[in-house]
Amino acid sequence: GLARTLFSWTLHAIVYFWLFPAYIALYTLVPKAAGGRVFSDQMGRVAFIMLLVFSVPIGFHHLYMDPFQAAGWKFLHMTGTFMVAVPTLLTGFTVIASLEVAGRLRGGKGLFGWIGALDWKNPLVLAALLAMLMLTFGGFGGMINASYAMNTMVHNTQWVTGHFHLIFGGTTVIMYFAVAYYLWPKMTGKELFSTGLANAQLWLWFIGMLVLTLPWHLIGITGQPRRISSTPYDESLVQQWGTSELIMVVGGLILFISALMLVYVLFRTHGNSQAVANPEVEYAESLHSTPRMPHLMNSYGFWVAMVVVYMIARSEEHTSELQS
């Protein structure tokens, strides 16, 4: 029980440290690259604070079926897991609204005309739109994982693996790729080798991730375990997994080709003789005026201290739980 407790509590929180940089790029780089502004600076700040507070103590939703965890702690972590959906929805709303502002400024008309007016040739804009789609699918799976009742159907199955690959390998990593395409030319002083090839790489990653993770969810629903020492491969249920696993192999190959394309574009960019037109990193500004924040609230040291105190408190809480 101790190993599973520490594993679920620590490693689930760690994935949010990978997600945070992707969110930062969505708020600070994407609106400017799209030609607009951040729809709400305050909403972004609230989303980050909520995500920080609720993302740390929620790992026990992987242990709903574990007999070593008390029901009260499971309920607490279930509540925290559902609360993570709030900053996620705030982020999705703010980013999409920021893109709509950019689309309207570029001449987009009608209810959805702003989507077509966006600069789809810009890797940052394209990646943000694809990331939002994968975050939508992955977020839906996360709500099922959070539910104490529905979790019983997917507990310790490949559904869980498909879910976090769609969020991390999809939403997070595709934003990392786009940021690399944005920052690498500014760091090297060389113009991006091929915007078209960069966009093709992003599309391939999006397609490959869906081809990989959707069958992963399916075989999870049909009962393929996430961790098991042995499997009776002669049963008819196990034989039904073959087609989905073959499709997943195709998805993995697509992702591999996409990753090679990323390396190729960055390598050719490094050797490009054409200098980058604008070497400065441009950050997005808020659409609405931002009220002055107390100096303490903008202090990096203050928030580091808050996180340390918070994590120590959570450690003491889990220690007392294990002792009881």
For the regions a language model picked out, list residue spans one by one.
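Histidine/acidic residue-rich metal-binding segments in metalloenzymes
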Residues: 114-124
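Membrane-interface helix termini and inter-helical loops of multi-pass transporters
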Residues: 66-70, 150-155
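C-terminal amphipathic alpha-helical interaction region
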Residues: 287-297
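Hydrophobic cores of alpha-helical transmembrane segments in multi-pass integral membrane proteins
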Residues: 2-34, 41-64, 77-103, 123-148, ...
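Juxtamembrane inter-helical linkers in multi-pass membrane proteins
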Residues: 1-3, 104-115, 274-288
